[in-house]
């Protein structure tokens, strides 16, 4: 019989993420294919491609944008009943986009730093490491033993939600 890979769903201590955000961005960037952030449309709403309230901050990342969804109501960790002006931006990860992510202020304090909210990293097109910043919550879905070891090496506390 083959060895079964065990995967875990984790709740991660948000304060630890804030304190180790650069190391986590590096790890997530190297172990993900894409990432998403949540922003809001700004007027004129009919412009295509649309204007976002975080346009100036996100301008450097624009060459790496692969998609956007206007009017999104659900994304990893969040569901909203309203919000037709909410936008999910999807970016591909590569050496340059990882560098730009690290260069900006702390992604886990978006309101303080004027950044889009709820950064989420995707592995094999599935949500893997995400946050709900205004709730101060962070998750890791389908975490591997390697992911757990990395969190432990960074002294980031987490709880396993499944065994």
Predicted regions and their residues:
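Structured alpha/beta or helical-core interaction and ligand-binding surfaces enriched in interleaved
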Residues: 1-163
């Amino acid at each position: 019989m083959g060895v079964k890979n065990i995967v875990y769903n984790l709740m991660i201590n948000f304060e630890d993420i804030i304190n180790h955000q650069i190391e986590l961005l590096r790890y997530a960037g190297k172990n993900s294919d894409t990432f998403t952030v949540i922003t809001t449309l700004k007027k004129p709403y009919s412009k295509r491609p649309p204007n976002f309230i975080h346009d100036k901050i996100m301008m450097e990342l624009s060459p790496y944008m692969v998609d956007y969804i206007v009017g999104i109501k659900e994304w990893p960790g969040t569901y909203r009943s309203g919000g037709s002006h909410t936008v999910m931006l999807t970016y591909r990860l590569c050496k340059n986009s990882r560098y730009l992510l690290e260069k900006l202020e702390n992604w886990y304090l978006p309101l303080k730093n004027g950044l889009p909210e709820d950064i989420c990293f995707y592995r094999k097109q599935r949500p893997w490491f995400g946050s709900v910043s205004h709730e101060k919550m962070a998750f890791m879905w389908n975490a591997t033993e390697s992911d757990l070891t990395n969190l432990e090496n960074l002294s980031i506390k987490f709880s396993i939600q499944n065994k």
